[in-house]
Amino acid sequence: MKFSEQWLRGWVSPQVDRDALVARLSMAGLEVDSVTPAAGVFSGVVVGEVLSTEQHPDADKLRVCQVSNGAETFQVVCGAPNVRPGLKIPFAMIGAELPGDFKIKKAKLRGVESNGMLCSQAELQIGEGNDGLMELPADASVGEDFRVYLDLEDASIEVDLTPNRGDCLSLAGLAREVGALYDAPVTRPVVMAVPAAHDEVRSVEVLAPAACPRYLGRVIRNVDLSRPTPLWMVERLRRAEVRSIDAAVDITNYVMLELGQPLHAFDLAEINGGIRVRMAEEGEKLVLLDGQEVSLRSDTLVVADHTRALAIAGVMGGEHSGVSATTRDVFLESAFFDQIAVAGKARSYGLHTDASHRYERGVDWQLAREAMERATGLLLEITGGEAGPIIETVSEQHLPSIAPITLRAQRITQMLGMEMDSAEVERLLNALGLKVSADGAGQWRVEVPSHRFDISLEVDLIEELARLYGYNRLPVRYPQARLAPQAKAEARSDLPELRRLLVARGYQEAITYSFIDPKQFELFNPGVEPLLLANPISNDMAAMRSSLWPGLVKALQHNLNRQQDRVRLFESGLRFVGQLEGLKQEPMIAGVVCGSRLPEGWAQGRDTVDFFDVKADVEAVLGFAGALDQFTFAPGKHPALHPGQTARIEREGREVGFIGAIHPELSKSLGLDRPVFVFELVLAEVALGKMPKFHELSRFPEVRRDLALIAHKDVAASAVLDVIRENAGEWLTDLRLFDVYQGKGIDTDRKSLAVGLTWQHPSRTLNDDEVNSTTQNILTSLEQRLNATLRK
């Protein structure tokens, strides 16, 4: 919300300077983002009047003007297309200094003397208009200092409001806050009801009362929209960063800024029959005021006539029903559209308007009539015309209702760490427009006004007290609690421990958004319907992630684009999966790796990381809680992973994650020019381990046997190891695969697996007969179950 300081001080003017006011607003939770001067730095500019003009003798586009400053007449050469006798303009006299250290001196233009300069808005930095002179009203006082005339010793203050403070998106709301902060009186403009000068009306039907509980309309005839908007209004709009369009649009924008109620003016001649507020028909077309044609969805509320949609309710009007300079009769709309009905609709159509910004945050449902009367009065004053009666349709059952709140002094003391005087509590809350009455000893009954839709609980009232009293004035009180130590399950590994493990293995932690681009969701999950947000932050953050990979890969791309060739990232967070019984939110831990296996160094090679390097990292995570033997890696399929480098990770038959290389087609789509490996694990499964069992170290020698086995190339090494474990007996202490070979001397459909087995008995030495017998059992089982034989 951006506004003029002088406009605000017209409502409430505490005896403090600008800096103090800005600081107090920020401390009260209305954070001031910027304070900018209302105009550039200039001096020596007065209100001038062009008395006469004549053609320059040597230049077709220049005019020689006689300009008065109220006391003298000066000859000025000007090339502006709109210069003419009788025009009043900003006149920079000799010696004036304009923005950019530009000094006005006597000069000759094509041989004709020029004593000053006639100025445009852009030259004085009071607007963007540079296609001609700034035209002042006919009643402008010639000779008056231009800065004084336009009250340019002003500033535009921009306040960054949190979404719950929609009540401050107006001068009325801001003035109410300032008045409460400084205990200063607030002078609200007196809005008089405009009597009807004719009886013409248009019928209003609200077919979606839950979305539009209140709708007001009024016919205003014989307006003259060719009349200019008064300069005082144009300036207030400009200082609020609102561009002047025409009188009707400017007035609706002005009232919106002043009171907080969005309004809309329709060209009455373009309305067929009456007004119908309804839900759009699926695929219904509407060309908006910005020229964009949209295809409406059935969940969009529209204002329509009897034949077509006229506007997206609370967002933007249609082009064909908008007012123009030729409009003679206007239908003025002032409505209360439900917050939920409007929320997200603007963004879903790629729009963001001042009206939607306010409706999404909440508009005072009792404000519509006052705003209608205020806009009508201004419209008649500026453009002429006659107003008809107000037509109002209300659905009382759908209007918001706020129940009274009980506020306890004990709770205030508990939360703020101090006792607050009862009179002070009542004064602060009354200053905000809340009705406070004592309700027994040490408590109050508080009625919340319609403009404070963010207050519904006792803690909300206490927050208001803290804001107005001043956070910086609250005493420091440390919390006291009796905390007993919590027993930790020894068979679990906490997330912080897993984080430290991955950091120790060369990873860096990343935090990415849970919202992703639906297009990116489709790349990682082709054919799967994404979970779309009803009110996304932006179109490229409209889907909930079903995996942590999209965010991690995006972070990887960001680093690769900045010459980081070795990237190892991990993240822990929720994934969101739609199920028949509802949304499943599951904590996951995932990683992405690319680049060299080891950091660059003189004694280290530059080998590129591969699948088995990442598998080793995953095994370290899986084994951290002591349950690595419960996990298995099996060949798997995943649409985002390389079909030949993908493993499904299982725990006792349950799928707990995936590991693999990014699919080549996906890499191409993402612009990745090197191998990228990823893993993702269900955090609950990873964290759950088992208690280790301790045994006395054996003092007897180990016995080792190495077996070279021939198996079909499609037989997984894990399957071979599982069969060996099942038949190796209880004294097997170590089993490892140390070589895999395919090539010369072995059939093309076979491969050689070399495994090492180590046995050790805790209380005696194993003899060869025992080991040989066990080895033979292993070989027999391998041949029977996997057709794997000893290599000869």
UniProtKB/Swiss-Prot annotation:
Ranges for domain B5: 400-476
GO cellular component: phenylalanine-tRNA ligase complex
SMART domains: B3_4 (SM00873), B5 (SM00874), FDX-ACB (SM00896)
Name listed for the protein in its UniProt record: Phenylalanine--tRNA ligase beta subunit
InterPro entries: aa-tRNA-synth_II/BPL/LPL, B3/B4_tRNA-bd, DNA-bd_dom_put_sf, Fdx_antiC-bd, Fdx_antiC-bd_sf, NA-bd_OB-fold, Phe-tRNA-ligase_IIc_bsu, Phe-tRNA-ligase_IIc_bsu_bact
Lineage: Bacteria, Pseudomonadati, Pseudomonadota, Gammaproteobacteria, Pseudomonadales
GO biological process terms on file: phenylalanyl-tRNA aminoacylation
Compartment(s): Cytoplasm
Source organism of this protein record: Pseudomonas fluorescens (strain Pf0-1)
NCBIfam families xref list: pheT_bact (TIGR00472), YtpR (NF045760)
GO molecular function (one): phenylalanine-tRNA ligase activity
Cofactor(s) demanded: Mg(2+)
SUBUNIT field: Tetramer of two alpha and two beta subunits.
Similarity field: Belongs to the phenylalanyl-tRNA synthetase beta subunit family. Type 1 subfamily.
Keyword terms: Aminoacyl-tRNA synthetase, ATP-binding, Cytoplasm, Ligase, Magnesium, Metal-binding, Nucleotide-binding, Protein biosynthesis, RNA-binding, tRNA-binding
UniProt xrefs under HAMAP family: Phe_tRNA_synth_beta1
Catalyzed reaction equations: tRNA(Phe) + L-phenylalanine + ATP = L-phenylalanyl-tRNA(Phe) + AMP + diphosphate + H(+)
UniProt domain tRNA-binding: residue ranges: 39-147
Domain FDX-ACB residue range list: 698-791
